[in-house]
Amino acid sequence: MKYFLMGLKHFKNVAIACAPDNVGLAHELIGALRESDVMPFDFTLKALMVKSDGIHYSNDFSRVETIWLVIQPNSLAWPLFSEKLKKIIEKMLTGKEGLKWISCNICCGKETRTYYIPHFIEELDVLNKDKCFYSNNGGLIKPAYSSLKIQDYSIFPKPSMNNLWQITAAICISDKVKKEIVKSKISCINYESILIV
């Protein structure tokens, strides 16, 4: 049994979906989205450039390798999945994951694309708590997942404090899901093995 923490490979210059300035912090939005399946605002795509004097945003995408990615980086640090990636994951779901999708629009000039945010509505018990490492305040430092507890899930969030597990970039997927993603020729995703006991 293999599972992986999935994430986007590193890009030096990337397009980032920026939420409007007035939307607040990401963790404050999670509760407000509990009953929603559509984001109440649109994201705007900007080119992110890292220079010696800091990070810069612009509308000049000439140095960006690929503008539209299957997992679009964004100012909320949430997973924004393309429709292609969403469909792959959807067909692999067991129905026990407690997952729904929130659609969002990302605008770039005259083009708008719909992306999807995986929103976990049930906190899944996936850890072998005896094998995990915790900080003095109870925060999870190194998770150890229970093979018995995760065997019925194709995707699940890395547990975290408060409600941050509901919408998180720390998403684990089964080897079957990974193989389907690779088979579909999606190459910009990084896979990190997780500890299963």
Feature locations, PLM:
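Internal, well-folded beta-alpha domain core
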Residues: 75-76, 86, 97-106, 152-155, ...
